[in-house]
Structures are given as structure tokens and as C-alpha cells.
Amino acid sequence: MITIIDYGKTNSNEIAESLEKLSVEFVISNKESDILQANKLILPNSTDISSSIKKLHLLNLFSILRIVEKPILGIGTGMHLMTKSFKDINAACLGYFPVECKTEEAQQNIFVHEQSIKIIKGTSLLNNISKEDKFYFEGDCFIPRNECTTSVVSIGSEITSTIEREHLYGIQFRPERSGEPGLQILKNFLEI
């Protein structure tokens, strides 16, 4: 079973629709028991990362998420929550990836568009993805390219579009708005 973690103002329902297309058993929840019983977790995109961090703390999920050892996929700001910190709001995040999430350089290049990604490291999350496939990006936050980056997208400069470390995965784009390539990414995560 997959648990999509509900920390308020997320795109959980859109992710749920995509998982339904893949005939996957899932639950949208913020209960500790659902997180611990799940085989895999999804941290969905949120409209406000600061509120998401606060909500995870209020629900006492921050500590649990830091120690759980199961595959986790962060989507959009869900991926940003997986970094060590969010520089612009001076907030500690989950610390899965040893890099800061930023907005300052992206402010001039707020991106809302479909774009292909450049794969720089082969990974199971990117199986059956080609350089012609386009993904839907939106937002003004980003993770700089780093040692965990597996693909990049160019918004003037190259930024991380996918990131991976052990059982932890993050994607900058929105798979539920990326058609078949987005569904393929979700399918790949489910098969990990």
C-alpha cells in the first residue's frame, strides 16, 4: 500500500487520480499508523512549504519521516522538504539530501511549462524515459545540481529535476500533469 502524506494544501487528490489509473492501493493520510504500515510513501506538492513544515511538526510526523526506512517519493515541494533546509525561510527540512532548497536565483525564471529533462545518471526511477519526453514544471523553488542529482532541466541554468539517494527519490516536475511520461515515473517508483 502507498500512503500519500496529507500535510495540507497539497495536490494529493491529483496524485490519487494518477495512482487509480495505475490500479494501485493507496490512502491519503496524516496518521502515523498509515505511514508505518505503508510499503512506500509520497510527499505531494504543496502550495506553501512553510505551512507544510509546520503541519508536519504539529502532527508529530517530522521525527517519524526522518527515521522511516522505506521508499519515499517527493513531488515538487515534497522534494524540497527532503533537503536539509529551505534557505529563504531559514527552515530545517527532513535532511534526506545534503543540499539547500532555494528560490533566489529562480525568481527571475519562474517556470510553468512542459520541458524535457537531461538524464545524467541512470536510475530505476527514469526507466523507459527518453530525451523526447516532456514533463510539466511549475514553481519558483529549486534544488541546485548536486551529487544526488540524476537529471536536470534548464531554466537559464541547470537545476535538479530528479534526485535520488538510497531509497529516497525526488522529482521537481508534476507527474500527474505530465501525461504518459509522468505516469511512467509513478509506475517506476511503484516497481522499486
Residues covered by each model-derived region:
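Structural alpha-helical scaffold elements that stabilize or flank donor/cofactor-binding regions
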Residues: D34-I35, I64
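Cysteine-nucleophile active-site neighborhood
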Residues: T47-H113
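C-terminal and late-domain segments of enzyme folds
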Residues: F142-I192
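An anion/phosphate-binding loop that grips the pyrophosphate of nucleotide cofactors and donors
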Residues: A38
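Pocket-forming structural segment of enzyme catalytic cores
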Residues: F86-I159
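N-terminal beta1-alpha1 ligand-phosphate binding loop
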Residues: I2-V24, N30, F173-R177
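Structural motif
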Residues: I42-P44, G170
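Short hydrophobic-aromatic micro-motifs
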Residues: G74, F135-E138, L168-Q172
